[in-house]
A protein has these predicted regions:
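Short hydrophobic/aromatic patches at helix-to-coil boundaries
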Residues: 1, 142-146
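Small/aliphatic-rich secondary-structure junction motif
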Residues: 3-55, 82
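General small-molecule cofactor/ligand-binding pocket signal
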Residues: 36, 88-92, 143
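Short, hinge-like loop/turn segments at secondary-structure boundaries
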Residues: 50-54, 105-107, 130-131
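A short acidic, glycine-rich active-site loop
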Residues: 54-70
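Structural beta-alpha unit
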Residues: 73-112
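Glycine-rich, Arg-bearing micro-motifs that act as flexible, cationic patches
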Residues: 111-136
Length: 146
C-alpha cells in the first residue's frame, strides 16, 4: 500500500500508538519507516514512554536533543521488534507541523502516521493541533491515530 511512511514521535502515548499503526502498514509492503522527532520546549515537566523518564521544563536545547535521540532510538527498537527492517531516524528542528510536512516532502513519503495528541496537548487547544495542521498541509496521505 505505502512504500515510505513517516511517523513523528515525541515520547507520548499517542506517538507510541501511531508507531504501532505505522509498523502494521509498513509490514504490509516492506516499506521504509522514517521516524522523526522534533525537540520542543515544553510548558510543563513531562514523562516519556519507553522508559526514558521525564523532561524538565528548564532542559536546554542540547538536553532536549539528547532525549530526542533516545526517543527515536527506542521507537526504532520497537519498530524492529514489530518486524520492520528499513528504518531511518531523523531529528528535526522548528515548528513541528511545518517540519513534519517538509521532511515528508524531502523524503518522498507516501503516508504520515501521527497521534492526534502529543506532549504539548494543552497548547493544541489554543493554537490548533499539529495533527490538524499536518492534515491540511501535507500532499501525501495522513493517518491520525487516537
Amino acid at each position: 500500500m505505502f512504500n515510505t511512511i513517516l511517523v513523528p514521535v515525541d515520547g507520548s502515548e499517542g506517538a507510541k500508538k501511531a508507531l504501532s499503526v505505522a509498523c502494521l502498514l509498513a509490514n504490509q509492503a516492506d516499506a521504509t519507516l522514517h521516524i522523526l522527532h522534533i525537540p520542543e520546549e515544553l510548558s510543563h515537566e513531562t514523562t516519556l514512554v519507553w522508559g526514558i523518564g521525564a523532561i524538565a521544563i528548564e532542559a536546554s536545547r542540547s538536553e532536549r536533543e539528547g532525549i530526542g535521540q533516545q526517543v527515536v532510538e527506542k521507537a526504532a527498537e520497537a519498530a524492529r521488534e514489530q518486524g520492520i527492517t528499513k528504518i531511518e531516524t531523523i531529528i528535526g528542528h522548528g515548528d513541528p507541523a511545518r517540519t513534519i510536512v517538509s521532511e515528508a516532502k524531502k523524503r518522498g513519503v507516501e503516508a504520515i502516521v501521527l497521534g492526534s495528541r502529543g506532549l504539548s496537548d494543552l497548547k493544541g487547544f489554543v493554537v490548533g493541533s499539529v495533527s490538524h495542521k499536518v492534515g491540511h498541509a501535507a500532499t501525501c496521505s495522513v493517518i491520525t491515530v487516537r
